[in-house]
C-alpha cells in the first residue's frame, strides 16, 4: 500500500516516536554483535546482509517466549493451568497474524510448515481439489521456486506472464497488460493467479490488489506470496474495495524477524469448506471410534493436526506485535530512505551492476538489493 506521511502535529509526533523505536530496535537483534574474522586478519562484529534469505531475531520477542515457556504444556487441553495458558497463547499468536495483515473475521490464519513453501504447496493442493474444472494457474517470471513449482505439480497448465522492461532494458514488475490478456484468454478455466508481493531477488513490488481485481473479474482467485514483502511494508489484505481483497496470503515467519517460527496461510475460510483436512491426526477431531471419525469444523484447528511448534508460533506473535507498535508505515519510510541512499552510493562504483530496473514507474522497490561486480565471482564479492 502507498505510504502517506502523517499531517497533524499529533500524528507527526507519534511518527517521530516510532522512528526512535526503530533506532532502538537496531541494537536488539540476536547475534548482531557476534565477532567474525576479517580478510585483514582482525576480527569484528558481523555485518548481516542476508535478510532477504532469513532475518535475525528480536531479543524482546525472545524474552516473551522465554517467559511463556515457563508454563509449557501441549495445547488443545484445559485440564491444567499450563495447558490452558499455552492454548490461549497459541490462539493469540494466530490473532497477531490476522491483525498484522488486516484480515477480517471471514479469514483464518493457519500455521503450516516452516515457511511459505509449505503454505503454497498446501493451497495448490486445496484449490486444485476444490475447483477441478479450473485447471489453469497464471504466475509470473519473477517468482521464487516456492511460488512456481507447486502449481506446476498440482495444476494441468501454468502460464508464466512476462515482466515490464524499462528503456534501459532492465526488468521491472509484472507486465499488467500481458497479465490481463492471459486472464481473459483462460477465463473460466483459470483457478487462481499466484504472484509475489515483492521479488526476493530485486525487491521490486507488484500491484497485488490490482491483480486480485483482475482475477476476480473472471471468477478466479488471487494467491499472494508475501514472504519477502511482509517485513518491509504494511499489508492490508482487504484492499480498498471488496474486489481488491486477496483470497490467500502466505507468510514466512523466519523472514519477519522470527527464525524458527512456522509458515502461515491467511485465507478465506470458505476455501477449506466441504473437504477433508489436508493432514489428519490429533487435535482436529470431535469424535473417533473404530469405524469413523468426525473432524471439527473449527478453523484453524481442522487444518493444524498434531502438536504445534509452540515456541515458534509464540515468537512470531510477539514479533508481529512489536512491529505493529512501531508501525509498518514507519518501517517502510525508514527503509525507503536507506534503500535510496544505498542504491545511489552503489551506482557510483565502476563495474557494479544492480539487478532490476531503477525506474520507479516500473520498479517500486522494497529494501532488497542484488548486485555484482564485473568479472568477479559472486562469492568473492560477498
Task: Please tell me what each predicted stretch does.
Residues 1-382:
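Pyridoxal 5′-phosphate
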